[in-house]
Curated annotation (Swiss-Prot):
Binds to the 23S rRNA. This is Large ribosomal subunit protein bL9. The keyword Heme does not apply. It comes from Shewanella halifaxensis (strain HAW-EB4). PANTHER family: 50S RIBOSOMAL PROTEIN L9.
Amino acid sequence: MNVILLDKIANLGNLGDQVSVKAGYARNFLLPQGKAVVANAANTEVFEARRADLEAKLAADLAAATQRAEKISALESVVIASKAGDEGKLFGSIGNRDIADAVTAAGVELAKSEVRLPLGAIRTTGEFEVEVQVHTEVKAIVKLSVVAEA
């Protein structure tokens, strides 16, 4: 199924690209979320008329994401207290939701889906640098300090 993208989509294309995707992906994800329209003559004309508006919206989203990333990077070390054993091994783990909640409590809104932990959950005390993907093109680093509860 050929579609015209209305947004930048990772591993697929940019705004205005006409790409061929599987019908299920288009029907169940791209079309309902407003990220694409079916590629036909009428939709192509409508898209070309709206192209400037869509590009301006993308630029505004990118600028807002860049500002959020700067706020996140400007944060001092975010501290999370958790129960731990004598050797610094946590009883449980620190995951995406815990990190997102701690950063939000520190004053910058952050969703758990934006936190990237490629090595899995944090299971020890110490200092960590966690990558946060605010936008497809914008990433930030959060300094995280995991300490044992008294």
